[in-house]
Amino acid sequence: MRPDRAARGRGPGALWAAPALLVLLAAGCRHPPQTAAAPATPPPDEPAPAAPAAPEASSGPIPVTELPAGGISEEDREFVLSHPPIYSENGQATWYVAPYKGRKAANGQVFRDDALTAAHRTLPMGSLIVVTNLTTHQASAMRISDRGPFVPGRSIDLTIASAKAIGLYRMGTAPVRIDVYQTPKPIETGGRWCVQIGAFKSQERAEKMKSALLRAYPRANVIEFSGEASFWVRIRPLGDSREEAERIVRRVRPTQGDAYLTRLD
């Protein structure tokens, strides 16, 4: 799915002139980008669970008191059971696999669908988290190893192993709570950031979008993903500043739609 977390993307900026932005809108945003579809739900061999309700706002960190053994190190398991989470959020989760299997994830390691890992746009790479399925109330610890999902309305993508661990595999998607227990870097400060825009099956269309963006954002670039929508355009602000990346998202999203603040480290 991704970049070199390079993907996951999650200097003082220059002032952009209004004419430059108008050129951008005219040249690059006539056609909505093609977005990657959610994975097909595997055929159930038992009655499928009822459709999940929309996720509620997080009521705050909730310590985990039980956690199945296996899949994560005993050290990680003991850390989660003996510490409160430092950050929590609610959102929608799904799982991903082929054609990502065998290719490098954003952390530079080969993607494994049997590992308890997940993709998130803004949590620091390597963060230790617990994901709880709010429909089945099953939970599992895992590590952030990739960037994404770059699909509207989704907060986190799980490997097949992670999805099975929380009862999400046959559901396809479900509301979840994400509790963060350990991060190699601060969540809210620092970091290197970019903005990912558009999802294209055609490299030619991605290059056209890049050309339009270059007029206002000289550091725009096209990157290739493993997936149905294989090409994305990424803008890196000067200094990889989060504040400037957020400003770019606000400028681009009203017309482009698929613009995602993404952490690189």
Write out the residue ranges for each language-model feature:
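Secreted/periplasmic proteins
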Residues: 2-5, 9, 29-194, 199-203, ...
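Sec-dependent N-terminal signal peptides
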Residues: 10-22
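Extracytoplasmic
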Residues: 201-265
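Generic alpha-helix initiation/capping and coil-helix boundary signal
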Residues: 19, 86-87, 238
